Amino acid sequence: MANLAVKVADLEAACDWYASAGATVTEPVAWENGRRADVMLGALQITLFTKAIYEDATTLPDEGFLHPALFVDDLDAELARHEKVLWGPRVVSGSFGTRRIAFVDAPGGMRLEFMEQIEDPN
């Protein structure tokens, strides 16, 4: 697993809260259609988003758990196992390098993000 994604209404307040809990928190940055920051809390990485990249494809609450992000070796093979892809695949780049990503709906009213690493970070 790469990280857990959480949507927050107030990114700065969420970053401050995690920092006061002892986490290492990156500075918020612009990301796709919103902003994001990464939180390292022990072995757990949480990515805080103000807007999910797939928000136009599904109904989401203003705040809450979005999805776990999972690495796969072959995104196309993974997606072939699912009846419907909610969003993607699409190539994204950032401090994490370059990845192909896609999202599927999963039982329990949640989504899964599958990520294939194309280029490692510089």
Language-model segments: residues:
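Core segments of cupin and vicinal oxygen chelate
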Residues: 6-46, 78
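N-terminal beta-strand motif that seeds the catalytic metal site of vicinal oxygen chelate
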Residues: 1-13, 65-68, 118-122
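Vicinal oxygen chelate
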Residues: 28, 38, 83-122
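Short, charged/polar, Gly/Pro-enriched secondary-structure boundary elements
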Residues: 43-47, 109-112
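Short, charge-rich, low-complexity interaction segments located
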Residues: 56-58
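Residue-level marker for the onset of beta-strands and adjacent loop->beta junctions
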Residues: 2, 33-35, 66, 100
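Mid-chain, well-packed structural core segment of small domains
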Residues: 61-87
